[in-house]
Amino acid sequence: MRRELFIFLLLLGECANVKVKVGHIGAVGSMRNAEKILQLSKEQLTQEGVLGNDFDIEILNQMGCGESYEGVAVGADMYHVQGVRAFIGPYCNAELDAVAKMATFWNIPVVGYMASSNSFADKTIFKTLARVSLRTTNSLAEAAAALIKHYGWNKVAIATNTGAVAFERVQSFEEVFHQRGINVVRKIMLEEYTNAKAIMNSGLLQELENSARVVVCAFSSTRDMNKEFMQAVTLSGMNNANYAWILPWLQLETKDMAPWLGENGEYQQNVKDHFANSFIIDDVNGFDNTLVTPFKERLEASGYSTDDLEMKNIYGYIHLYDALRLYALAVRATMNETGNENSYLNGKEVWNHMRRITFPGLVSNAGVTSGTVMMDDIAERAPVYAAFYVPPNSDTVRKVCELEPVMLTNCDGTKTGNGCYELQVTDLSTGFWPSIDGSLPADEPACGFRNEKCDYTTLIIGGCIVLLIILLIICFFILSRVCENRALANTPWRIYRDDFRTIQENEMKSMLSIGSSKTKMSNMSMFVKHHAVVGTNTHASFHLYPQRRPIVFNRQDLQLLNQMKQAVHDNLNPFLGMSFNEKEEMVVLWKFCSRGTIQDMIYNQEVSLDSKFHGAFIRDITLGLEYLHSSIIGYHGSLTPWSCLIDRNWMIKLTDYGIANPLERWEKLGLISTETLKEGDDKSGSAQKTSLLYQPPEMLKNKESNRTRRMDQSWVKQSQARRQMGDIYAFGMVMHEILFRALPFPNGTNVSEVMDYIRDGTKTFRPTVHDRTQIHPDLVALLLDCWNENPEVRPSIRRVRLNTENYLKVKGSLVDQMMRMMEQYANNLEKLVAERTGMLEEANVRADKLLGQLLPKYVANELKMGRSVPAKTFDMATVMFSDIVGFTTICSSSTPLEVVSMLNSIYSKFDDAINKHGSYKVETIGDAYMIVSGIPEENGNEHIRNICNTALELMLLLKTYEIPHRRNVKLRIRLGIHTGTVAAGVVGLTAPRYCLFGDTVNVASRMESTSEPEKIQMSQEARDFCVRYYSEFQITLRGTVEAKGKGPVTSYWLLGKQSESQMQQQNFSQLGI
């Protein structure tokens, strides 16, 4: 209807020419040359056909918004004198208030384009007022409320300042928050145009800290007041991830006037950092030059210059352009709808057509989101806002969400008092907040601002329990320390002198039977000299040290001796204890090992040591050392071949461990005396029993110059590490002796000279491997590493163990190797048993198969189970006999082997035919053959068919059979068949046979004997039974024959078997078909 009416009005042409005067009231000193924008808007409307001959606009421009409200007078003059029937503006809120109220009385429309006051949204007062400005107080309040609800906040505080402008804004925010269910928990009011220092000194920030975590800032001066307030917040330490600051941006200038830009446009990072962790709500193009470029291009494309325009008021120009378009479009729509050319005089009607209208604005074609103008239900522009997050320590502003209006249906804004739209929040970014998980802060602490929401009873009780536990732990520690001291004082390792007795050498040899046993070591004399018995039956070896003064053990000594007493490992010799402060001697006792020391083994030439012994001994020593190095004891300290004992299981047990350091200290204190055996110039390997040879060089050098030159003094202070590296050196010496049965020095070397060379740092004399052909090169390198002069370069005991096990192919101790050999033997034995068992099973299978060929399967199974098979009478079975015709003649002209070969060949074929047709061969006697079916397994009536099929196949086989040694002679047989009752059973125990008995057998035999060559003779009973159940067989009457013992009997010839097609043809013939 509207379209047709519009076309009709256009056709009127010259008949209806309406020219409306529109008055624009600008502002003195703002938006120069605003009439240029209005003229551009009018030209665009004319191009679009909105304005034309029937409807045109005349624009009158006047200035207002001065100090004396001259804009109000200008408005009255325009209406009464100049005939203006619509207003655009005034620019400022105060004058727009007066002009809009008069326009309501005059019933003419007013389009505001810069005023932002919330009061203009009341359409009960401003009935003909529409606004196209992007930012208004009430829309910003709606945007702030939508953002707050979107992030789940329900409690906020408002920060504002004194003054009418701020009061009006706060009132608008409070009303919207109340409508949206947002509770304003606190409102602070600052002095207008105050500074950051004054804000901090006012104490108001502390009030915010104690009442809110989400704060909305609604100041009269958006730029200046927010700048000072956020500086105060930052200096007060409240600008962090626990607070959210929401800044609704009412500034209408471009981003050149952002608060962190100076007067000359310079960027101020320190000011911007004050705005960190805040949300700035602005139109969707805020903090951007998005509108500037398309605005200039649009004006220049229309032939206008932008040089005389104020680009900082770009929003004002855009709104002014959109205001004229809104009015013209509304008038055109009104005229089209009413058909009355004077309808533009009805301001209320024109205002109604400004509601819910959407049209392109000045920059809508440039892809700018805010370029399109959408009016709500009370002719207010529905804005498109965005929330911008200001990240800390960054020069950018991040858009995190957009708030787009969505119009509501079934809503009348004139009744509800609002624009009938909702702001829909769309997230553009998440996880941006500088918290641990990126989540925004809650609107209040979990326990409230005064901890009123948390029950601390559990926490207090828990704290008391924790405190009690700590006290108990302290008490337990003190008590355990006391108990430990008591336990140390109890000295479980102490052995009183009266509790053991030493054994003389002769007595020991008698006890161990050394003299009579050839398997014992002959060099155990030194070992058995130090033997004792503790208690009644515990044999021990001991070391005796003369004691000069009483020994008082310190805590470290007591701990070490307790640890030695508690040490348990397969390759450690148990420490039995010590006897001290008695009889002026100190005795250290260890468990006795019956096979002596490894030194006795090495230097006994009667004993042969192969690689298995080498690997097992070295492995045991490394395992023992590895345990000591990883235990609390920490080291051995005096490793020598005679401190490696061999138990009765040929396992190495390390002895004398851990005691070297205390002995050295006690000797320096003058408490005991340690005796060192010096063998002088004795060069035999077995006599060089001196521990000094196994001491590393750093332990023997006693000159300060040598110590400082050869090693770092700080390392020497580390006693445990020093002792461990000394163990590695000593292990290298012992391993060389095990492998080569000699010390790692040239033959003929004097022991005393060796020790002197080692002590003297000016001469180089080190152990070396002289015969390197017998062992792996890597093992040689390992030995040399163990003897390295620098202790820090020597390998760890773990590396030594892994390398020796790898190079010597060690797989356990000697007992382990013997067990593996026994296990291998057992596995071989099991394999042999399995093979023999398999052979036995295979023989059993062959025997079972052979037995199954001699006897029926059922009978064979019963006999194998040891059960007897009773004779049984079968009511109906069929027996067949066969006989080779002329067999005697053939045998007379053949050798026995040829006869056997012939019979084996023909009977093998017969056996296959018998098995094929479910028959059983009872026996063969020479050339005679007895076959039965239905015995021993009954098969109903099938026995006659099985025998007939078998007989026919035997005849067929003989037609193609040739005697191997007589190709020209044809083999012929006679067959006889009879059906009847048969008795069967097993006869004999040694060679059991399954035999058939009864008249049926005799008759079958007579049928064979009276038959003719190459023919199958059947008795009357067999023929009748076959014809009754199986008519496919071709049987013809022979006549009467004389059977021995039976007299004359009637017999038949079995000629063959009809095929299925012949059977069908015969049946059809009988039916007459």
Curated annotation (Swiss-Prot):
Residues bearing attached sugar chains per UniProt: N336
Catalysed conversion reaction: GTP = 3',5'-cyclic GMP + diphosphate
Enzyme class: lyase
Coiled coil location: 813-844
EC number, as in UniProt: 4.6.1.2
Domain of life: Eukaryota
Ligand binding (Mg(2+) 2): D883, I884, D927
GO terms assigned for molecular function: ATP binding; GTP binding; guanylate cyclase activity; metal ion binding; peptide receptor activity; protein kinase activity
One GO process term, biological-process aspect: intracellular signal transduction
Keywords of this entry: Cell membrane, Cell projection, cGMP biosynthesis, Coiled coil, Glycoprotein, GTP-binding, Lyase, Magnesium, Membrane, Metal-binding, Nucleotide-binding, Receptor, Signal, Transmembrane, Transmembrane helix
Protein known as: Receptor-type guanylate cyclase gcy-23
Taxonomic source organism: Caenorhabditis elegans
